[in-house]
């Protein structure tokens, strides 16, 4: 995360300073800086626009307000904030090796990246747990609306608690006329505390939740692919329901795998640096770090693209959101897809199914349901 980058870059930067004030061993040619700036600008624009659109699609349409989709909103909000408040500012710091943004933002920058990443991955974990209950144990009670809000609030509180130590020990220092945002651990065991903190953070916001999701989606996959549709229903709603659930599993597995791939090199970078600090003294490490940081931050922009490509309701939502663009032409079906309420006959035909489905397949939470999620959304389409 960006906060880790600040710790490392700031703590080692003074040893890389040249004798000339304002010039560091990390200085790069203007054309190279322009290329990196363009890459990061594209990342931030795509991530902020895409995740803001996902949030709008869900919150602006009653049919999309489901347990799973509220966790999707939480994930999108964390990714949006990560791109807006971490990617851009940390790029400026890493490329110039000077902190321009003041003491208060130094504390924030050492608090928020860990918080946002924790919220992102545990929102994915909550989705996996919710789908596990819905598919593997379909007759067990689902999360209520208050329960969903409580889980989301709990995720944010735990995330802030995990990030607090780094925020607490962050400070502003001056090094040969250059301002640095650094994390100063207690002097007695500073290096040991830094290593321990890195390992704990990586375990809690990467290894543990990925293992939980691997187990959950493995069980979900086995359950779905072993399930058979009765012969007399091979062309009916049951087959569509099964296909929708399988497509959901593929979608969320793609989201999780993308996240894991984007962040793995970045975490490995800091684990290696904790044991071999001399790697930070090489001039090329700035380019390595900028590449790894871009890859990690790029995880914030892929989810909206995945939703749009694999989920037809989100495709409809994106068409409506960008209808002002000359190359985007939303249809009446796109509007119906997000607002249509099926007929009573369709409800009766589907009321026997207890399970709920990703994005399109759940009943939207409302006061009328007394806060308890019910069965499947009426009018479940062929895909989730």
From Swiss-Prot:
The family database entries (PROSITE patterns) matched by this protein are listed as:
G_PROTEIN_RECEP_F1_1, G_PROTEIN_RECEP_F1_2
> Topology relative to the membrane, per the entry?
Multi-pass membrane protein
Write out the topological domains of type Extracellular: 1-32, 91-107, 171-196, 273-290
Q: Which residues lie on this side of the membrane: Cytoplasmic?
A: 57-69, 130-149, 219-251, 311-384
Location in the cell reads: Cell membrane
- Cystine pairs annotated here are 106-181
Do you know which Pfam families this protein is assigned to?
A: 7tm_1
Top-level division of the source organism's lineage? Eukaryota
The entry lists its GO molecular-function terms as:
substance K receptor activity
What do the Gene Ontology cellular component annotations say?
A: plasma membrane; sperm head; sperm midpiece
Residues bearing glycans: 11, 18-19
Q: Give TM regions.
A: 33-56, 70-90, 108-129, 150-170, 197-218, 252-272, 291-310
The GO annotation for biological process reads: positive regulation of flagellated sperm motility; regulation of uterine smooth muscle contraction
* Lipidation positions, renumbered (S-palmitoyl cysteine): 324
Keyword terms: Cell membrane, Disulfide bond, G-protein coupled receptor, Glycoprotein, Lipoprotein, Membrane, Palmitate, Receptor, Transducer, Transmembrane, Transmembrane helix
Q: Which family does it belong to?
A: Belongs to the G-protein coupled receptor 1 family.
State its role.
This is a receptor for the tachykinin neuropeptide substance K (neurokinin A). It is associated with G proteins that activate a phosphatidylinositol-calcium second messenger system.
The name this protein carries in UniProt is Substance-K receptor
* Origin species: Canis lupus familiaris (Dog)
Q: Which gene encodes it?
A: TACR2
């Amino acid at each position: 995360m960006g906060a880790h980058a600040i710790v490392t870059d700031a703590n080692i930067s003074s040893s890389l300073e040249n004798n000339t004030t304002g010039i560091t061993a990390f200085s790069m040619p203007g054309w190279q800086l322009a290329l990196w700036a363009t890459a990061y600008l594209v990342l931030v624009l795509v991530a902020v626009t895409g995740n803001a659109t996902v949030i709008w699609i869900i919150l602006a349409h009653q049919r999309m307000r489901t347990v799973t989709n509220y966790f999707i909103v939480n994930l999108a909000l964390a990714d949006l904030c990560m791109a807006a408040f971490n990617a851009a500012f940390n790029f400026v710091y890493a490329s110039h090796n000077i902190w321009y943004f003041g003491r208060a933002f130094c504390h924030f920058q050492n608090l928020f990246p860990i918080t946002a990443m924790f919220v992102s991955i545990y929102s994915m974990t909550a989705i996996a747990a919710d789908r596990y209950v819905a598919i593997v144990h379909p007759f067990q009670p689902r999360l209520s609306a208050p329960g969903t809000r409580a889980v989301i609030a709990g995720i944010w509180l735990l995330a802030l608690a995990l990030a607090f130590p780094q925020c607490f020990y962050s400070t502003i220092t001056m090094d040969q006329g250059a301002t640095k945002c650094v994390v100063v651990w207690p002097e007695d065991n500073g290096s040991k505390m830094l290593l321990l903190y890195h390992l704990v953070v990586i375990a809690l916001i990467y290894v543990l939740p990925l293992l939980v999701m691997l187990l959950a989606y493995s069980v979900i996959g086995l359950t779905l692919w072993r399930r058979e549709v009765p012969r007399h229903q091979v062309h009916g709603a049951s087959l569509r329901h099964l296909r929708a659930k399988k497509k959901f599993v593929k979608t969320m597995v793609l989201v999780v795998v993308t996240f894991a791939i984007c962040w793995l090199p970045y975490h490995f970078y800091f684990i290696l640096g904790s044991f071999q600090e001399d790697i930070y003294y090489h001039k090329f490490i700035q380019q390595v770090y900028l590449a790894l940081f871009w890859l990690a931050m790029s995880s914030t922009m892929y989810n909206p693209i995945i939703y749009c490509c694999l989920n037809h309701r989100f495709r409809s939502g994106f068409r409506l959101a960008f209808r002002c663009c000359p190359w985007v032409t939303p249809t009446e079906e796109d509007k119906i897809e997000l607002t249509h309420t099926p007929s009573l006959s369709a409800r009766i035909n589907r009321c026997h199914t207890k399970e709920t489905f990703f994005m399109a397949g759940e009943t939207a939470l409302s006061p009328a349901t007394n806060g308890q999620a019910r069965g499947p959304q009426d009018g479940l389409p062929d895909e989730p």
